[in-house]
Amino acid sequence: MMNYSKKIMLMLVTASCLLVACGPTPQQKLEEQQRLARELNDSINRLMMTGDSAKIFDALALNDQLLQLDTVRENQFRYYMQRVSMFYQLGRDADAFEIQEKAMVLLPEDNYDRLNYFAIKNEKLGNTEKAEFFFTMALEACDEALEHGAGKDALINKAAILYYQGKKDEAHKVIEDAYLQHQDDEDLKSMATGSGIWDEIEASTQKMKAIKLEQPAKTDSIHKH
């Protein structure tokens, strides 16, 4: 029985032949490309939801095709993060972390997620001064985003960065101060008085700290080690 990867490949080849034979306009080519990208993405998501390792490897093969087909910057970011998620599902955390860099460099240089990623990476590689520089920049980026009304994402990221650095009291104070300023906000109340968000941050911190990077870095391979 033909697997997902082969089916999608056949679909792509057939569509390409039709495009050449009919001589489509640039707009038609773009629309067909977008349609194929959506179908690939839907197939990948279905395979990922199974949690089955063999199907996730099929999904990675489709993800390769998707990255080649759709080169729009913001879409590439999503596809790389999709790839990162699959490597985490396979238990290959170090590979996932390395691949994440390909997504992070697609973000603006002053993006707090990007800055935090490179802070953690430099810390893991023993580049303490660089790590501290990036952590500081990431926190400043969070502050700037909050000043411009970025919402809770920047707030949670700031708390998570401080927590990762071992500054747990400061992390809690970030949330508590925000709640004191907006006591009618139920989400902030839940974060300030409950443990849910902190359980998530603790789990994320421990997972990230457990990742060990090797030099030279591992390659983005879909083959089992």
Give names to the regions the model predicted.
Residues 59, 63-66, 103, 138, ...:
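Alpha-helical solenoid scaffolds that mediate protein-protein interactions
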Residues 1-22:
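Sec-dependent bacterial lipoprotein signal peptides
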